[in-house]
């Protein structure tokens, strides 16, 4: 978890912090804890959350995290409740996730996370589809069944996409921009050339994933490209604000 801090001391992150407006730098804090109980984070203090919640196949890595899909959803309900508490009014929480195939069964993770977040007070603002390169996966045993049995009813596609779910706590007060120093407001402007050239304005983003290369420090950790949080931070936060 990443929140505003200075030399290990927590700061008030309920509003843009004037101490960082001059240098436009970033301050980082890592908390090893449980997202179901984020007591370290003040209420209404987070301006943007970008997270990849535990995938439903996480028990392969964390066998005690949940025993079945109902327990998985219970975990997400607890996380959603805490996220609603720590999120400032009008601000955004983003989840990168997708439906999951486990032991031959497909689970509707995207729709269930959406329902859980709405039930915990968030508005469902939008969904962006993250498409990975076609070369990310070759024909697998799943999709390759058609090669062995080229008949109807044998089709199971390989997945090269995930969903970026965007939720909002209430409505954003756009008069907030008037309260920001001009330097902060102008420094937070979105690069329109990049916005147009890389098609940020579409509901489909083509972004190369991080390959799980042998010897990588992150081996075994979800391949999560930095480009996704970079875009979301640019689109949904201002300089001096707090990102979780």
Regions found by a protein language model. Give the residues of each.
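Core catalytic lobe of class I
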Residues: 1-244
């Amino acid at each position: 978890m990443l929140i505003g801090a200075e030399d290990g001391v927590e700061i008030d992150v309920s509003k843009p912090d004037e101490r960082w407006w001059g240098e436009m730098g970033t301050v980082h804090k890592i908390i090893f804890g449980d997202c179901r109980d984020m007591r370290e984070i003040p209420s209404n203090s987070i301006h943007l959350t970008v997270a990849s919640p535990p995938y439903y196949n996480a028990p392969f890595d964390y066998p005690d995290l949940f025993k079945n899909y109902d327990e998985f959803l219970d975990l997400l309900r607890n996380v959603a409740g805490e996220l609603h508490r720590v999120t400032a009014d009008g601000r955004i929480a983003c989840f990168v996730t997708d439906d999951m195939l486990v032991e031959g069964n497909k689970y509707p993770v995207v729709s269930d996370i959406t329902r859980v977040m709405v039930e915990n007070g968030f508005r469902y603002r939008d969904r962006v589809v993250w498409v990975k390169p076609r070369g990310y996966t070759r024909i697998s045993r799943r999709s390759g069944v058609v090669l062995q049995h080229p008949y109807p009813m044998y089709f199971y596609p390989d997945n090269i996409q995930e969903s970026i779910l965007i939720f909002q706590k209430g409505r954003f007060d756009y008069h907030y921009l008037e309260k920001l120093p001009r330097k902060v407001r102008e420094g937070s402007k979105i690069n329109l050339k990049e916005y147009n050239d890389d098609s940020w304005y579409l509901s489909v983003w083509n972004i190369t994933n991080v390959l799980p290369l042998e010897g990588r420090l992150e081996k075994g950790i979800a391949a999560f490209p930095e480009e996704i949080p970079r875009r979301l931070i640019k689109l949904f936060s201002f300089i001096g604000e707090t990102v979780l």
